[in-house]
C-alpha cells in the first residue's frame, strides 16, 4: 500500500509501528514514547526500544474511556481528553506495562458527542488548550464554551475561553519563534441546496490567533466572507478574524505541526504540515493527504501544496485517512491513520 504514496524527491515513507487500531492524535514522551489517542475507548503507547525507527512494542494505557482522541505530555505525565473529562496519568513512561489509575483534572466539559472528540496540547504559556466543537453542523449556543478553544491550568483550575467562533478544530500548534497559535478548522456541511455549491463551499481554514479573545466567525461567517444562510445576516463578516489560508472545502483538515526538525533540508524549516482526513460527503472525494503551508517573513501564510498523497485511489476509494502529524526527535515526520490503524514515518 505504501508504494502508492507519492512524496517530493528524496523523501520516503515506512510503517512506524505494529497496528494501532483507530490511530488519531499523537504526543511524544520525554523518553521517546509515542502516545496515540483514538475515537474508540483506547489509548496506546508505542516504544522503539532498539532504535531501528520501528516501534515494536505497543502498550495499552487505557481501554475503557469515552472517545479519548486527545493526548498531551508534560513533565512526565500523560494527559488524555475524553468528551467531557481531562485525565492525567502520572509518570507514565515508568509504568507503560502497568499504567496507574488516572487523576481526573476536569470533568465539567460539555458531553455532546457531535464534534465531542478533542485534540489537546500544552502551549508555551504552560496551559493546556482544549477545543470544544459546535454540537451540530451549524447552530448557536448560549454557553460560550461551544465552538471555542479553551485553556486551563495543568491542575484543571482557571478554565477560560481563548478563542471564539471555531466550529471544529482538531489540530493546532504554536509558531516556534513567535509562540503564536495556529489551528485548523473544519467548515460546515450542506450550505446550499445546490450540490455543486456544497462541493466547493465553504472552505476549511488555517487560522492564526495572535492574542486571546478573537472571534473566527462561526456560525455567522465561514472562511473570509461566506455568509451562513441561517445566521449570516446577523453579523458582518468583517467583524471577525479571517483565516490565514482558505483550504479546499471538505478536505477535513485535522492535525497540524510546524516542522522543527533537522532531517529535512533548511527550506522546510517552520513549514506547517497538515493532515487532511478527507471528505465524506463530496461528489468527488478530496483530501486524504498531507499538505504543506509555507509562511512569508511576516509569518503570514504564503503557499499551500500537496506533500504526501496516494491514500485516495483514482477510483475515489480511500484506503487510508491521515489524522495527525508529529515531528519525531530525529526529524522524521510521523503521520497517524485511523482507517488503516497505522502510524507512518516520513524521512529523508
What would you call each of these model-derived segments?
Residues 26, 71, 120, 169-172, ...:
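Hydrophobic core register within WD40 beta-propeller blades
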Residues 31, 38-39, 83-85, 91, ...:
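Short loop/turn segments immediately following the C-termini of beta-strands
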Residues 22, 30, 57, 64-67, ...:
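Beta-rich catalytic cores
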Residues 33-37, 77-80, 127-131, 180-184, ...:
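Conserved beta-propeller blade signature
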Residues 19, 29, 74, 121-125, ...:
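Structural WD40 beta-propeller signal
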Residues 1-9, 117, 134-137, 147, ...:
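Beta-propeller domain segments
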Residues 15-20, 59-65, 105-112, 161-165, ...:
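Surface loop/turn motifs at the tips and blade-to-blade linkers of beta-strand repeat domains
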Residues 57-58, 67, 72-74, 84-123, ...:
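Asp-box/WD-like beta-propeller blade repeats and closely related beta-sheet repeat scaffolds
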Amino acid at each position: 500500500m505504501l508504494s502508492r504514496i507519492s512524496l517530493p524527491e528524496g523523501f520516503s515513507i515506512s510503517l512506524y509501528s505494529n497496528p494501532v487500531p483507530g490511530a488519531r492524535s499523537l504526543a511524544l514522551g520525554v523518553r521517546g514514547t509515542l502516545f496515540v489517542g483514538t475515537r474508540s475507548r483506547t489509548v496506546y503507547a508505542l516504544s522503539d526500544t532498539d532504535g531501528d525507527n520501528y516501534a515494536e512494542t505497543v502498550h495499552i494505557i487505557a481501554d475503557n474511556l469515552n472517545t479519548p482522541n486527545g493526548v498531551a505530555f508534560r513533565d512526565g505525565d500523560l494527559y488524555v481528553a475524553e468528551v467531557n473529562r481531562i485525565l492525567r496519568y502520572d509518570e507514565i513512561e515508568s509504568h507503560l506495562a502497568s499504567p496507574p489509575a488516572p487523576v481526573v483534572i476536569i470533568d465539567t466539559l460539555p458531553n455532546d458527542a457531535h464534534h465531542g472528540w478533542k485534540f489537546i496540547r500544552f502551549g508555551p504559556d504552560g496551559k493546556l488548550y482544549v477545543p470544544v466543537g459546535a454540537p451540530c453542523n451549524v447552530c448557536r449556543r448560549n454557553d460560550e464554551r461551544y465552538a471555542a478553544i479553551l485553556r486551563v491550568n495543568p491542575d484543571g483550575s482557571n478554565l477560560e475561553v481563548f478563542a471564539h467562533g471555531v466550529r471544529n478544530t482538531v489540530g493546532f500548534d504554536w509558531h516556534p519563534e513567535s509562540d503564536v497559535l495556529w489551528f485548523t478548522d473544519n467548515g460546515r456541511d450542506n450550505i446550499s441546496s445546490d450540490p455543486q455549491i456544497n462541493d466547493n463551499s465553504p472552505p476549511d481554514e488555517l487560522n492564526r490567533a495572535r492574542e486571546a479573545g478573537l472571534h473566527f466567525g462561526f456560525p455567522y461567517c465561514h472562511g473570509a466572507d461566506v455568509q451562513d444562510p441561517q445566521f449570516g445576516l446577523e453579523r458582518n463578516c468583517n467583524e471577525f478574524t479571517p483565516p490565514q489560508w482558505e483550504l479546499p472545502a471538505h478536505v477535513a483538515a485535522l492535525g497540524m505541526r510546524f516542522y522543527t526538525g533537522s532531517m529535512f533540508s533548511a527550506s522546510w524549516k517552520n513549514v506547517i504540515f497538515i493532515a487532511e482526513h478527507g471528505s465524506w460527503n463530496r461528489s468527488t472525494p478530496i483530501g486524504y493527504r498531507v499538505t504543506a503551508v509555507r509562511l512569508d517573513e511576516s509569518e503570514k501564510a504564503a503557499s499551500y501544496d500537496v506533500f504526501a498523497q496516494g491514500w485516495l485511489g483514482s477510483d475515489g476509494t480511500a484506503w487510508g485517512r491521515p489524522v495527525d502529524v508529529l515531528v519525531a526527535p530525529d526529524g522524521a515526520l510521523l503521520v497517524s491513520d485511523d482507517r488503516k490503524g497505522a502510524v507512518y514515518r516520513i524521512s529523508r
